[in-house]
Amino acid sequence: MSAKLTDLQLLHELEPVVEKYLNRHLSMHKPWNPHDYIPWSDGKNYYALGGQDWDPDQSKLSDVAQVAMVQNLVTEDNLPSYHREIAMNMGMDGAWGQWVNRWTAEENRHGIALRDYLVVTRSVDPVELEKLRLEVVNRGFSPGQNHQGHYFAESLTDSVLYVSFQELATRISHRNTGKACNDPVADQLMAKISADENLHMIFYRDVSEAAFDLVPNQAMKSLHLILSHFQMPGFQVPEFRRKAVVIAVGGVYDPRIHLDEVVMPVLKKWRIFEREDFTGEGAKLRDELALVIKDLELACDKFEVSKQRQLDREARTGKKVSAHELHKTAGKLAMSRR
């Protein structure tokens, strides 16, 4: 099928595919409990209950690990916005609705587990963490909200294709964060979360592939738009750019990882450059996609140069941005108004 379909028509056409992949997801998902991966015996009361409040010396995580863990947590915290956006695009009926609710339930556990780990292990300032979490959820994640002016999803194919890349990127970020923690408990926790994210990615990736078979030109338009303007959902977090630099320089997630481990594998799975069913604007956009990839390659090269400059500067001056400094919220948070 190559005729243009409305979102409602596409939802109907893809319903059997969604039901098939939902059942596959349920059969592949391995149950796990977040509380099993929190070192509760390491915890102790804070001042309000007669204990001691947080001190920076109590954190056993590196600056990179602290920044990455907090960024991952506050990104997961914005689940109310993600649920709204996905529900608006995919609907709440039938297999689509069952998937939206199942996905939301699984994602909700990730934020709970990450917050428990950080607070129990005293890895970061819990007061600053709560201020940041409130701010991030208040800012939300929605096209045009708070005059952000950033692209998200305007159609069903926009939404499904975007999360195909985003879930894979999140899986890799979580897994690399676990390794950066240098703590076997954190590594196990992040491995469990990453496994969930991988199954989410597989679901969206394969539903997207079915969309390419049904409406190749529509899907190609979405693909070109997404890769040209891609941003991780945590872009609205205060000090995002500075935190992203720390995470990238630390090897958790950088432009090269994004291109080689996220973008290219998904494009290969969808056979974007081998397909022969693109016509008109779809064919033109597919050709232009090669230029988008070239731009991503250039971004990788520029990042490596910038990374080396920063490392040289830190070695020369002995100064580097600390996680504690980045997570201080004073003067950075202004609760957003709609």
Curated annotation (Swiss-Prot):
| Recorded metabolic or biological pathway in which this protein acts | Lipid metabolism; fatty acid metabolism
Q: Give any Gene Ontology cellular component.
A: cytosol
Which Pfam families does the record match to this protein?
A: FA_desaturase_2
Leader sequence residues: none
Region Disordered, residue ranges: 314-338
Keywords of the record, alphabetical order, are:
Fatty acid biosynthesis, Fatty acid metabolism, Iron, Lipid biosynthesis, Lipid metabolism, Metal-binding, Oxidoreductase
GO MF annotation: an example: metal ion binding
> Its family?
Belongs to the fatty acid desaturase type 2 family.
State the protein's name.
Putative acyl-[acyl-carrier-protein] desaturase DesA1
Q: Which organism is it from?
A: Mycobacterium tuberculosis (strain ATCC 25618 / H37Rv)
* Gene name linked to the record: desA1
